[in-house]
């Protein structure tokens, strides 16, 4: 075991301590426990070549962390896909020869429900115990023959944070086969940027506010950080006095604008992704006035807008009625262990679809001239939804977590 742990002030509480970790994974490491505060999590140490879906966790306070990971092995050829927390993609499937090592650095945001000693986010039962809301920073590597040789973790106070607010089309979905663009967009940002995905399935702009989720974002936000909001899917289902696109929804969006700007943040809207609802080969509008209401508020308040609504329409229509299912959770019974019934969902993306929408999102930001796009990775390329990636060549290794229950807000 080769671990270095430096505490800037041993007498300070954990939340105030600066920590640096260096783990040599070519040597024995323990199973995770609260007592050790680090180790292999959920699965045993990867003693056998070919073992896939390995987790390693470190107990750390809330904040951003600069993480450097070396993949590969001196003993064998490897194929590794690297993810963080709840399946946030960091490194796509990467094949390396025996003795070939490759090092990557990125910045990962870790958070808990706590805002202050007395205030916390009102997370739901499904979120409790998830990797996005616990007291650990977790890395996950999978593949045909994955290997990680070294992990270095240090607090980071310099990265720009991009906070995501939204619903099930944005959230870090905890379980396969569900996925959202928020957990794929991490693939395209360098270590100068951390993505903090605060979205949750079933939320409206109003419930996001009522559950103290924006309070949590603002507690972490520093001047110059970004807040990206995608709402509309669930807002259109609200009933009661004031419900509708042009009153409650517009009013709630204005609250986001005012509060983020008051805190020194930069706010961006993105219109809701389309549902797969075809008629005569064309996607039909299912969101009513909500995309237009978001655009109207954005024009009035000078908020940049990424048009995911338009881009996903083109994407679905390009794939066509049948192949568009390949981007969503459409799987016959028996595709996954324990899956006893067919999954057919025309709202929620699978990893391929989420990856494509993440490419749309980064392209939209780039086209708007948003300054944070200067930190896109060197292999990033602009995306045209009229020419999507081939779903047959997309590689994703399922995690050990599977759920056949549709996300809230379907």
Range-by-range predicted roles:
Residues 63-69:
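A short tyrosine-centered beta-strand micro-motif
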Residues 19-21, 27-34, 58, 95-101, ...:
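Conserved catalytic region of serine esterases and O-acyltransferases that act on ester linkages
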């Amino acid at each position: 075991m080769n671990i270095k742990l430096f505490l800037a002030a041993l007498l300070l509480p954990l939340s105030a301590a600066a920590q640096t970790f260096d783990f040599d994974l070519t040597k024995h490491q323990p199973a995770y426990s609260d007592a050790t505060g680090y180790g292999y999590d959920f699965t045993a140490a990867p003693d056998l070549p070919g073992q896939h879906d390995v987790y390693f966790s470190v107990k750390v306070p809330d904040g951003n962390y600069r993480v450097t990971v070396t993949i590969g092995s001196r003993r064998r050829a490897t194929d590794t896909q690297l993810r963080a927390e709840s399946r946030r993609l960091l490194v796509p499937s990467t094949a390396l020869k025996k003795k070939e090592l490759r090092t990557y650095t990125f910045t990962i945001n870790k958070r808990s429900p706590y805002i202050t000693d007395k205030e916390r986010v009102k997370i739901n039962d499904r979120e409790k115990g998830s990797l996005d809301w616990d007291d650990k920073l977790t890395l996950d590597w999978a593949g045909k023959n994955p290997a990680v040789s070294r992990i270095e973790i240090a607090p980071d106070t310099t990265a720009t944070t991009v906070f995501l607010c939204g619903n099930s089309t944005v959230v870090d979905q905890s379980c396969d086969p569900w996925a959202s663009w928020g957990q794929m967009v991490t693939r395209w940002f360098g270590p100068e940027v951390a993505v903090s995905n605060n979205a949750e399935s079933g939320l409206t702009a109003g419930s996001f506010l009522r559950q103290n989720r924006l309070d949590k974002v603002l507690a972490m936000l520093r001047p110059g950080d970004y807040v990206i909001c995608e709402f509309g899917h669930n807002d259109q289902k609200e009933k009661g006095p004031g419900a509708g696109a042009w009153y409650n929804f517009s009013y709630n969006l204005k609250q986001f604008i005012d509060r983020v700007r008051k805190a020194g943040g930069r706010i961006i809207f993105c219109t809701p992704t389309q549902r797969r609802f075809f008629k005569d080969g064309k996607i039909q509008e299912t969101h009513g006035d909500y995309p237009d209401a978001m655009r109207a508020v954005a024009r009035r308040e000078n908020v940049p807008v990424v048009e995911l609504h338009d881009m996903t329409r083109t994407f679905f229509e390009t794939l066509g009625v049948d192949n568009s299912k390949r981007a969503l959770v459409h799987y016959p019974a028996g595709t996954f262990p324990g899956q006893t019934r067919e999954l057919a969902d025309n709202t929620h993306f699978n990893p391929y679809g989420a990856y494509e929408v993440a490419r749309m999102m980064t392209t939209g930001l780039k086209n708007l001239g948003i300054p944070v796009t200067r930190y896109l990775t060197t292999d990033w390329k602009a995306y045209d939804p009229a020419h999507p990636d081939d779903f047959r060549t997309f590689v994703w290794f399922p995690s050990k977590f599977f759920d056949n229950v549709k996300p809230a807000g379907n």
